[in-house]
């Protein structure tokens, strides 16, 4: 089987597993909390999965020389307009989370424009970096910084928009990480990368200390981390460093219990306890904890192996491509998927603060699923381009 066909089936398998878990982990929430039928979330995710796979297959058949840039610019410019438009929509046409409007209600389906903007932003970076950093000869740090200024302006504007209108620091961190690493892949120096990371860290600290709910999240994270970390230190040192009276992270606490209950082989599909009111949204951001409880450590390893295969296949396609903007886009898709997975997994494990990022393909959410299918579909079209 060819690389692109393997990629299609690998992504489809992850989508199937996500649909399966959307039923297994959401039945209690669906019936008890929302008073829907037990198949409510399952059917919605199944419909999104079918549409996503069809889109993925359809995009794999398009000619990227004609459609890649058109689709990329569409995803770059239309979602921001929708995000701004949501601010003026009545509550009947929009859904809120975290104090911000994030979804447009379209009857059976709710659309989250930010999920599609991430693909558009990745396209913009690939398209633009291929014209600047890739096309230029080796430059010193000062010249690189001058070249980087327009990107920083675009990112700051994006960060302000997402931060103010969407109140979503997690997505800003994700897009910033993609920008920084993609700069290195496009030929930027390690010194430039270090300066960008330093600046991003300073801005992140400022964003945290100016927001009460982010400070609380940081305290919840440190409360859980110090309990695990200080067990490795001598008692006297641990007691000296410990900060008492910190709130305990409800989500991470129950996620840890779920992973402990799952053990090596898991409780069995549908037999987990975490979904029974302990974590009502386990089928979304905490899906890895639900998988760990029902499928065990081995089941979780299977999921990570599938993601690893997916990433390797995309890298192989990127390596075959001669056009820099195409190969950079493929790398950007890898970064979006891998960073989302790692940030979510580290949040569930208590290593990082919980950021609310979905696990690609596995977490419940039609917009996230469709956006990832579009990204994979475009990669598949580029793989077909290498054959032509």
UniProtKB/Swiss-Prot annotation:
Enzyme nomenclature, EC number: 2.4.99.28
Q: Name one GO biological process term.
A: cell division
Substrates-to-products reaction catalysed:
[GlcNAc-(1->4)-Mur2Ac(oyl-L-Ala-gamma-D-Glu-L-Lys-D-Ala-D-Ala)](n)-di-trans,octa-cis-undecaprenyl diphosphate + beta-D-GlcNAc-(1->4)-Mur2Ac(oyl-L-Ala-gamma-D-Glu-L-Lys-D-Ala-D-Ala)-di-trans,octa-cis-undecaprenyl diphosphate = [GlcNAc-(1->4)-Mur2Ac(oyl-L-Ala-gamma-D-Glu-L-Lys-D-Ala-D-Ala)](n+1)-di-trans,octa-cis-undecaprenyl diphosphate + di-trans,octa-cis-undecaprenyl diphosphate + H(+)
Query: In this UniProt entry, which residues form the Cytoplasmic topological domain(s)?
Result: 1-6, 60-70, 127-144, 187, 316-327, 380-388
Q: Which cellular component appears as one GO term in the record? A: plasma membrane
- Which subcellular locations apply to this protein? Cell inner membrane
- Topology, Periplasmic side: 28-38, 92-105, 166-168, 211-294, 349-358
Disulfide bridge positions per record: none
Report whether Coiled coil shows up as a keyword of the record: no
Which keywords does this chain's UniProt record carry? Cell cycle, Cell division, Cell inner membrane, Cell membrane, Cell shape, Cell wall biogenesis/degradation, Glycosyltransferase, Membrane, Peptidoglycan synthesis, Transferase, Transmembrane, Transmembrane helix
The way this protein sits in the membrane is described as:
Multi-pass membrane protein
Taken from the record, one Pfam family name reads FTSW_RODA_SPOVE
> PANTHER family per the record?
CELL CYCLE PROTEIN, PEPTIDOGLYCAN GLYCOSYLTRANSFERASE FTSW-RELATED
Please state what the protein is called.
Probable peptidoglycan glycosyltransferase FtsW
């Amino acid at each position: 089987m060819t690389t692109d066909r393997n990629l299609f089936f690998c992504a489809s398998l992850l989508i199937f597993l996500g649909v399966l878990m959307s039923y297994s982990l959401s039945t209690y929430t669906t019936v008890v909390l929302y008073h829907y039928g037990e198949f409510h979330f399952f059917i919605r995710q199944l419909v999104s999965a079918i549409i996503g796979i069809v889109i993925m297959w359809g995009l794999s058949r398009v000619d990227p020389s004609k459609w890649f840039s058109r689709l990329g610019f569409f995803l770059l410019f239309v979602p921001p307009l929708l995000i701004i438009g949501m601010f003026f929509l009545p509550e009947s046409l929009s859904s809120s989370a975290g104090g911000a409007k994030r979804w447009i209600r379209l009857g059976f389906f709710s659309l989250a424009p930010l999920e599609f903007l991430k693909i558009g932003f990745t396209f913009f970076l690939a398209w633009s970096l291929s014209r600047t950093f890739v096309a230029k000869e080796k430059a010193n740090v000062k010249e690189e910084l001058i070249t980087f200024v327009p990107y920083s302006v675009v990112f700051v504007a994006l960060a302000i928009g997402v931060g103010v209108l969407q109140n979503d620091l997690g997505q800003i961190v994700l897009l910033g990480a993609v920008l920084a690493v993609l700069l290195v892949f496009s030929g930027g120096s390690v010194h430039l990368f270090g300066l960008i990371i330093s600046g991003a860290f300073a801005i992140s600290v400022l964003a945290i200390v100016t927001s009460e709910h982010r400070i609380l999240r940081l305290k919840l994270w440190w409360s859980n981390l110090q309990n695990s970390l200080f067990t490795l230190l001598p008692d006297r040192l641990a007691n000296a460093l410990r900060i008492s009276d910190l709130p305990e992270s409800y989500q991470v606490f129950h996620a840890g219990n779920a992973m402990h209950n799952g053990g090596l082989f898991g409780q069995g599909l549908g037999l987990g306890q975490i979904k029974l009111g302990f974590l009502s949204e386990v089928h979304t951001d905490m899906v890895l904890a639900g998988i760990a409880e029902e499928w065990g450590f081995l089941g979780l390893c299977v999921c990570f192996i599938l993601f690893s295969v997916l990433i390797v296949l995309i890298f192989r396609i990127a390596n075959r491509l001669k056009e820099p903007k195409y190969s950079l886009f493929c790398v950007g898709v890898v970064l979006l998927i891998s960073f989302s997975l790692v940030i979510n997994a580290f949040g569930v494990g208590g290593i990082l603060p919980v950021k609310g990022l979905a696990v690609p393909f596995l977490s419940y959410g039609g917009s996230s699923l469709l956006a990832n299918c579009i990204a994979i579909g475009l990669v598949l079209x580029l793989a077909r381009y290498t054959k032509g």
